[in-house]
Amino acid sequence: MTFTVSTISAGVVRLAVEGELDAVTVPGLRKEIDKLSATSPKRVEIDLSSLRMVDSSGVGAIVSLYKRVRGQGGEVVVVGLRDQPLAIFRLLRLDRVFAI
């Protein structure tokens, strides 16, 4: 599991997640979320194009990021969803919550 945070422009941050996002890897993501939230970004793009699998704990971490950023007045966009992660987002109707 790899997490990469990069600044796209002033106030815009991209979080790229690669591999599998499950109960084992979520603690690492939560650390990145804490660091990212501390900067109070106006927009967070979550790049899931290299995410192969997500379980309920992974979805919970993504929703947690969404709530934190929205609570600070920011926007969260999910890009690159495909395969199993896309099916999970649709099943949970998160495609209605996130701009995908």
Regions found by a protein language model. Name each.
Residues 1-16:
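Short beta-strand/loop segment at the start of cytosolic alpha/beta domains
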Residues 20-97:
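Amphipathic alpha-helical interaction surfaces in cytosolic regulatory modules
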